[in-house]
């Protein structure tokens, strides 16, 4: 009996973790478009994947805007006359992009499309897709700006501001 019981106890201890399953969420993003394009994120003409928003004080309502472009790498895509940029992040709120991974409280990121069909359109939870172009003139670079902004009704405290969002560009 002891010979049978010992292996059973050992196997139960070793494999007990396999019975409890973890769940999670996977986000998918893509685009169906008339032209496939390589897109770079540029700040001041330099390719960057991180937008440095600088600093603001707890007395400030907003930080300075930092302009950045989504830049197509082919002439065919630079000549497109209409398109859409879709943004995806678990951090989008009604006012912008939450400080998802930073330590500061009461601050979010205001993300604004500059040369969109409706100029200076903010990207929020309720508006994650932005249209560009008039169907006649070339769009060129897709221009955006971002800044830190104090969240209404919350106390702004010192700390870091770190968040992320994914984009997809679809030309029509």
Positions of PLM-derived features:
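Mature extracellular/passenger domains of Gram-negative fimbrial/pilin and adhesin proteins
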Residues: 20-172
């Amino acid at each position: 009996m002891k010979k049978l019981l010992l292996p059973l106890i050992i196997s139960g201890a070793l494999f007990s973790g396999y019975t409890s399953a973890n769940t999670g969420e996977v986000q998918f993003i893509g685009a169906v478009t008339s032209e496939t394009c390589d897109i770079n994120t540029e700040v001041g003409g330099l390719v960057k994947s991180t937008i440095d928003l600088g600093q603001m004080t707890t007395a400030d309502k907003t930080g300075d805007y930092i302009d950045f472009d989504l830049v197509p790498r082919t002439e065919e895509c630079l000549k497109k006359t209409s398109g859409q940029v879709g943004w995806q992040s678990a951090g989008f709120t009604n006012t912008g992009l939450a400080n998802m991974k930073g330590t500061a409280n009461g601050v979010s990121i205001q993300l604004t499309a500059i040369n969109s069909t409706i100029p200076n359109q903010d990207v929020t939870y309720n508006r994650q897709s932005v249209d560009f172009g008039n169907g006649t003139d070339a769009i060129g670079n897709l221009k955006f700006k971002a800044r830190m902004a104090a969240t209404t009704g919350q106390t702004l405290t010192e700390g870091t501001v770190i968040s992320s969002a994914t984009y997809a560009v679809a030309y029509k």
